[in-house]
Amino acid sequence: FQKGALMEQFGLRTRIIMGDGLDSLTAGMKKAFVVTDSFMAQSGKVSYVTDKLNRAGVEWQVFSDIAGEPDIGMVTAGTAKITEFDPDTVICLGGGAAIDAAKAIVFIAKKTGNANKNIEFVAIPTTSGTGSEVSRFAVITDKTKGIKYPLIDDSLLPDVAVLDAQLVMSAPPSVTADTGIDVFTHAVEAFVSTGRNDFSDACAEKAIKLVNHYLMAAYKNPNDAK
């Protein structure tokens, strides 16, 4: 959302696919760089992506050196890997931290001329709450200085977000609770923002109602698709 002196604009640049829609994106894909966190890789959950890539005959490489909040070291390592692999697509599977890391990796690789400028960026969130898959923000930490650096740029936006409820249902109850409250917090923040408008109000109100009606049920029964 952008607000100027004489006009307001509301837009969502990221294309959203709801459901198990990654297969529809593999046509024409040749090399995919998969960014995920260490848990997703070690638990085998990254197969949600790699199995589909194998079926489509796509060459792939996984970068999973992400644990906790993304820091400069993780992003630097990821940038080196993506430069070496030279993919046409980046696919991120994970929560807000993994998506932020992938955003920074793609952003820096492009800015330094070490990645294809036309690389497609696909984000597949495994939690609700941050909305990182459709935002122009990323936060990277410098652990040595104890400083968090915000990155803000339209080029950080993923080209496509795949929202598959099955991935969220696999989260443990504690994560469902934490990210559910995160959804509520972001919705309230949007509703009281000085940059709010009728479109954002409608989205915020709907999110607040959904959290109120369904968060406790999702916490108690993660397999309840409703």
Q: Where on the chain are the PLM-derived regions?
A:
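N-terminal small/polar loop signature for handling phosphorylated ligands or for N-terminal nucleophile
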Residues: V46-K117, M216-A225
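A glycine/threonine-rich phosphate-anchoring loop and its flanking beta-alpha core
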Residues: K110-F199
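Active-site segments that bind and position negatively charged phosphate/pyrophosphate groups
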Residues: T194-K226
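Short beta-strand/turn micro-motifs composed of small residues
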Residues: T36, G94, T141
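Conserved beta-strand elements of the Class I
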Residues: A32-V34, T89-I91, V122
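N-terminal amphipathic/basic leader segments beginning at the initiator methionine
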Residues: F1-M29
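Small-residue-rich anion-binding loops in enzyme active sites
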Residues: D20-V58
